[in-house]
Amino acid sequence: MFNIKFSFFSIISILFFLSGLTALVYQIIWMRQLSLFFGSDIYATTITLGTFMAGLSLGSYISGLIGDNLKKPILIYGILEIFIALSAALFPLIIFGMDETFRIVYQNYFFDQPLKYQLFRLLISIFTLLIPTIFMGATLPLLIRQFAIKKIELGEKVGFFYSINTFGALTGTILAGFILIQIAGITYSTIIMVITNIVVGIIAIIFSFNSFEKKDNFFPKQSQKRNILDEEKIHIFDPKYILFSTFFTGMAALALEVVWTRILVKSFSGTIHSFSIMLACFLFGIFYGSKKISKKLSNNHYPILILFKLQLWLAATVALLAPLTYLAPNIFGNLTWTLTSLMDGNFAIASILAQFIVASLLILIPTTLLGASFPAAVKSYINNFDFRARGTGYVYAFNTFGAVIGSLIGGFVLLPIFGTRISLIIIAALFFFSALILRKLIRRIENYDSIIKFHKFLPVIIFMASSIAISIMPDKTIMNYNMQKNSRPNVIYHSDGVSSTIDIVKSDEDNIIMMINGNIEADTGYVQRRQFVLIGHLPLLLHGEANDVAIVGLGLGITLKSLLNNPLVKNLKLIEISPEMIEAHQLNPEISGNALNNSKLEIVIDDARNYMKMSNQKFDVITVSPNHPRITGVGYLYTKEYYEILKDKLNTNGIVLQWIPLYQISKKSFDVAVKTFTEVYPNYSFWYVRGHGLFVGSLKPINLDFNDFAERYNQIPIKKDLLSIGIKTPEELLGHMLMDKANIISYLNSGEKIIINTDDNAYLEFHTPFEFLEKTESIVSELFPYVGWKLGSILKSYSNVEENKIKDSFDYRVNKLFSELKEKIQ
């Protein structure tokens, strides 16, 4: 009989592991798909995550209400898994079927009634996410109802199933972040998970009707002998206070995850793998903590004492680690380069290992305590063993609902008002508050003071010492390894904002440097200025007359100033996702002068892709200079679907200029980026500034009259701006064109078949983080044999003198392709 029961228990345990795995993969996929549907700004992300967590909370609560009355909880579990699969299969069909409806809502409400717009996004999230997440949240109480057959093993079973499901989620995080989506893409990953859920559901349903379960169902009746003395020891208080404590623990936990994510993203550079690593470490701690505590709870008469100690030590460890967060980028940088040298230059593996190590140092101890808290809370709460499903459901529901509130507080209150390190102290105080709620109850336990004496004072001392340390630390610190190592920059602006952390500093050479979440994104050094100024003027000079121009991204405002100073521009629309970036320029006029107050400028705070997709406006020129594709989320600004959106927003003679890096990217990934761009636009050319590719795409061929082009160039504001980056004549400007359409086609056809970067495969986002050490020389050397262009490809009229000057300028640029890469960059 033991073997039969063990076999049934093992099978359901494996199924529950798979439930956790699929749930996390779904969460990652759904958040990606919803970001494509209604934008990836912080409000969209928060709405999506909040709805997901709220569904889990509601599902657990409902399951708790009805679970104890179910005769076959495993049957219901199996049915729920199949419903989850069906919901996941329908998810993309539902959201992308609402495209036109959402476009109407956007156009009517985004600008004039933003609250209604956000409410509609919330309704979409509820409509698409709530049902499957309710089903997910309902599963744990059902398994506790089935398998917690003796009161003494309640804590053990809760801890076991909570840990096995969390371990599944951990596996799903690593699988989705490193393997599955990268290999199979979003669509096939969804199909694989749907099939997995269906198989899990069918197996659970089959076993719910067989002899194994019947024997298990009789087992509780034979074994459940109550020890009245034990129950009196365990429950000498009102258990509803456990729910309040659990709520605040969940609130603190998710706020902690939000703050840790910001800290580690700034330390690691926010690649898609960085987020997966952080989440994996978080989940591993919860898994390990719940697994380790489960055995100890079996014979413990006072689980509330364990819960009380856990909350105290959570407060202490979070506070203790807060001052150490400043060292995270330095530890990560040194560790990465040390491991790289030990691994014969394998930066990719070294970086991943270093991120895991640093994340574990900050996260693992507190999350282990968090993982142990849930089983302890469940056992502390349940008065009547006959209502074990209800107790489990209620505790899980309160904890998860607290997590919903915590995610909002962490992102919208703590970070923008207090910054990262002070936020950690406040979160530690929340854990202390959770412990104080419990202290009122445990005082009824005989000799409780002598039991917790050590645990009462030491955590408080640690908390106070850490708080003092944080209070005397500088509030403006640069979370960038190279900055910390090589210089002590003057901080012009620092903001831990709602959407991102913005740092603008002045270097030792008086260059202004802008960082977003720890990544250096722009500076006023000569090389960077050259590409930013060209991004502004080049498409306008090629177009001739641009009544409506759009610029994606503000950065340091160099391109923006060039566009505003260009007399060819009549109306300019800036689309910037980060309100903190706008604030930085408004508070520091030295960065971009008075550009943001220019009468020609209209500012839109939105995800650029979402705005272009939803707006009806068309443009003569669109300039796109996104971050490097290795930064998470930015890869969507390099996909075929995005280029098609931009193409649809061009007027008949419209031009798009897209920046594509030639540094920290492999030749293969560069080829993917170029091939993707050329798949969409019928006409294109490649312009080059050291390490930076400027790709010009248009609906119609560009046919310039050189005299008209030169006349536009010689307008004083344009000529002055271009002289500042060393371009003295219109011929020299044309010399920056490296390849025309014919030469680009020859280059792309010279090697193996090149894949297209799409929303589904996200090739660049998943591959470029591993290519940090790739050099520009490797790409330039492969491009070199195909460099060249015919003047007739963009010029319809020119003199022999002009032809010779253009060719001389081109030859000069080509001859410098390799030598300039050896010149020092500030």
Task: List PLM regions with ranges.
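Alpha-helical transmembrane segments of multi-pass membrane proteins
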Residues: 1-711, 768-775, 789-796
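SAM/dcSAM-binding transferase cores
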Residues: 706-818
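Alpha-helical tetratricopeptide repeat
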Residues: 396-399, 811-825
